[in-house]
Curated annotation (Swiss-Prot):
The keyword Transmembrane applies. Its main location: plastid. GO terms for cellular component: chloroplast thylakoid membrane; cytochrome b6f complex. One of its GO terms (biological process) is photosynthesis. This is Cytochrome b6-f complex subunit 5. The keyword Chloroplast applies. It comes from Chaetosphaeridium globosum (Charophycean green alga). InterPro entries: Cyt_6/f_cplx_su5 (IPR003683), Cyt_6/f_cplx_su5_sf (IPR036099). The chain crosses the membrane at residues 5-25. It is a single-pass membrane protein. SUPFAM superfamilies: PetG subunit of the cytochrome b6f complex.
């Protein structure tokens, strides 16, 4: 009963992690344009 729970948690976390990475990369890209990093 543990494996389906873990797989569900992983499958739920992967899209959230990818979305977070895309958002942070986009925000850093926007900031880089404004502040010239």
């Amino acid at each position: 009963m543990v494996e389906p729970l873990l797989s569900g948690i992983v499958l739920g976390l992967i899209p959230i992690t990818l979305a977070g990475l895309f958002v942070t990369a986009y925000l850093q890209y926007r900031r880089g344009d404004q502040l010239d990093f």
